[in-house]
From Swiss-Prot:
It holds the Pfam family COX15-CtaA. GO terms for biological process: heme A biosynthetic process. Keywords: Cell membrane, Heme biosynthesis, Iron, Membrane, Metal-binding, Oxidoreductase, Transmembrane, Transmembrane helix. The chain crosses the membrane at residues 17-37, 107-127, 132-152, 164-184, 203-223, 264-283, 296-316, 320-340. This is Heme A synthase. Pathway: Porphyrin-containing compound metabolism; heme A biosynthesis; heme A from heme O: step 1/1. Heme binds at H267, H327. Its EC number is 1.17.99.9. GO terms for molecular function: metal ion binding; oxidoreductase activity, acting on NAD(P)H, heme protein as acceptor. It is an enzyme of class 1 (oxidoreductase). Belongs to the COX15/CtaA family. Type 2 subfamily.
Length: 365
């Protein structure tokens, strides 16, 4: 059964309840991404050196527990090499950021799983959406493991987490978010928009490049590469830095992940490519009189333009927390608009779908 036919099974108020639930989960994920960004920017991500999915829900409640948590932090290289002499009060500040980030992860897990099980029990979700929503849950469980895998990279030899693992962690969170946004749009059962195949191709390319750009941005963040080369449009004194500076590490591919100049340069070049592609897509959609797809393309181009301005300001000011978080927040908006644009251009044609019989609200199945 196709997605649109499947959504025929979900009549109000059933479909409304499912969409409200998924909207809340998507909003929580967006908040968690921003809290994660603040945790990184405040260098708080390694303040909790243990992984306790259940018992770690409660923070330290007594002086003895606080001192024990602080002593645990003192055993890792970040404290010894960067924060030696930190007071307990200062430790509490970074602890609360990381604890809040982990708590949000637990809240999201509960906010997703419990209503999902209830909807399944009530027969509110058909077979196709069951598979999709179980898949999203599996990605969420994987994300918890990836989060600890990331933190573990900074507990023994490094003074920070691996930028590659950080990028994987962020990108997986955004893939989960995008999957929920896509599902929400499909459940809305919007009429399809007739459009040329080239519009679909450029929309899909925009979505793929947006995810790649978010991954590259996470590499910049993980390396603190936004705190160097704080000029624009020049970088390292040129529009295109010398090959010797871009590719000095061996083997060559390490520069893509470890070289501050190369990582920031890649992020800039991808931003230019995304902006140009979004402009082309918007012009094409408007000229094609693509209706809702034209307005969607214009909104996406506007968001990418704002994102570009915020990115430039963030670099010029050496990554202040406020600008960096605004840049990350608008990145989530860009991703949302890119997902919606692809979905509206690739939605199945309703006329080709068999009509399913509505199921009464109280009847399972």
């Amino acid at each position: 059964m196709t997605a649109a036919a499947e959504s025929e099974r979900l009549r109000p108020p059933r479909v409304r309840a499912v969409r409200i639930w998924l909207t809340v989960v998507a909003a929580l994920i967006a908040v968690m991404v921003l809290v994660g960004g603040a945790t990184r920017l405040t260098e708080s991500g390694l303040s909790i050196v243990e992984w306790k999915p259940v018992t770690g829900t409660l923070p330290p409640l007594t002086d003895a527990q606080w001192h024990a948590a602080f002593e645990g932090y003192k055993t890792i290289p970040q404290y010894r090499e960067l924060n030696a002499g930190m007071t307990l009060y200062e430790f509490k500040t970074i602890f609360w950021w990381e604890w809040s980030h982990r708590l949000l992860g637990r809240v999201i897990g509960i906010a997703y799983l419990l209503p999902f099980l209830w909807f399944l029990w009530r027969g509110a979700i058909g077979p196709q959406w069951k598979r999709a929503l179980w898949g999203i849950f599996a990605l969420g469980a994987l994300q918890g493991a990836v989060g600890w895998w990331m933190v573990a990279s900074g507990l023994s030899q490094r003074t920070e987490v691996s930028q590659v693992r950080l990028a994987v962690h962020l990108t997986l969170a955004l893939i989960i978010y995008a999957a929920i946004v896509w599902t929400l749009r499909r459940l809305a059962d919007k009429p399809p928009i007739p459009a040329a195949a080239r519009l679909k191709v450029t929309a899909i390319a925009l979505l793929a490049l947006t995810l790649l750009q978010l991954f590259l941005g996470a590499l910049v963040a993980g390396l603190r590469a936004g705190r160097v080369f704080n000029t624009w449009p020049l970088i390292d004194g040129a529009l295109i830095p010398s090959a010797e500076r871009l590719w000095f590490e061996q083997p060559w591919w390490k520069n893509l992940f470890d070289n501050h100049l190369t990582v920031q340069f890649d992020h800039r070049m991808m931003a230019y490519a995304l902006w140009a592609l979004a402009a082309w897509h918007a012009i094409d959609a408007v000229r094609s009189r693509a209706g809702g797809a034209a307005s969607g393309a214009l909104w996406l181009f506007a968001a990418l333009s704002l994102q570009a301005v915020l990115g430039i300001l963030t670099v010029l000011h050496a990554t202040p927390i406020g600008l960096a978080l605004a840049h990350q927040a608008v990145g989530i908006v860009v991703l949302t608009l890119a997902v919606l644009q692809v979905e509206r251009l690739t939605a199945p044609r309703l006329k080709a779908l068999p009509r399913a019989m509505p199921v009464p609200v109280g009847q399972p199945g």
